[in-house]
Amino acid sequence: MPDAIDDLFRRFGKAFNKADVEEIAACVTDDFEWRLNAGAAPAGTVLKGKEGLRAHFSDKSKAHREARYSEARIHRAGDKIFGTFRVTGVDHAGKPFDRYGIDLYEIKDGKIALKDSYLKTID
């Protein structure tokens, strides 16, 4: 039977796929942290708060066109949550991409507080 966490991730996933920044922001805490899959070591680029999220999506639309997430699954291991997914699209150079990824999540007060992202690196 679905519960509040399932509903949260269903809303979050739909909003993410549509790049609906305000709906995504409604699913995360005010102090939300997103550790991107690229950037400076060790954590990659770290976005902080809803404003960091909004700024990323305004830039991301220029970097990745037609990004589409599929095969998304949420998995629970005790109090830990992780999501697996496939993302396809076109990068900033116009080259198509197709990758699998995983996100590690922390939940606080019924919202997503941390999204730590990892993608397969394909040559």
Regions from the language model: what does each represent?
Residues M1-D31:
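Short, low-complexity N-terminal intrinsically disordered segments enriched in polar/charged residues
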Residues A4, D20, A41, K48, ...:
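A beta-strand edge to alpha-helix "cap/lid" segment located at domain peripheries
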Residues A15, D31, R35, K60-A63:
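Generic N-terminal helix/loop capping motif
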Residues E33-V46:
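A short gly/proline-enriched turn/hairpin at secondary-structure junctions
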